[in-house]
């Protein structure tokens, strides 16, 4: 879906829930706090969580392959740069060099059969 735009910047991203099955993810661009950021949403057993695609340790995108954020067993999100592990439900570091840090969450709303991530103009 094409994001809604205010002043040329996407402020809302949405997708069909069916397009993000359990253990999978989707990337998007959104306007957040006066800048464009790449975000991603993950489906954890029917619960959806969204984060900025930025490792708090390495400062690089997390995906180890395009749009792949989960470890092979789908228990954690992982940073492809140095192998930091993050809890998908909270974004908190679960292991590796990210110790004490967490991913930056983005607000998620579920409406009918869609997931909606809302950005910010301020």
For the regions a language model picked out, list residue spans one by one.
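Short cysteine clusters
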Residues: 55, 79-82
């Amino acid at each position: 879906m094409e994001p809604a735009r205010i002043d040329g910047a996407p402020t809302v991203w949405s997708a069909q829930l069916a397009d993000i099955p359990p253990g999978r993810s989707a990337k998007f661009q959104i306007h957040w706090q006066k800048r464009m950021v790449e975000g991603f949403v993950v489906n954890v057993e029917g619960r959806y969580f969204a984060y900025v695609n930025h490792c708090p340790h390495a400062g690089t995108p997390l995906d180890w392959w395009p749009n792949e954020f989960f470890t092979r067993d789908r228990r954690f999100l992982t940073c492809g740069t140095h192998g930091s592990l993050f809890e998908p439900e909270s974004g908190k570091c679960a292991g590796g060099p990210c110790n004490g840090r967490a991913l930056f969450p983005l607000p998620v709303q579920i409406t009918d059969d869609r997931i909606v991530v809302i950005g910010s103009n301020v």
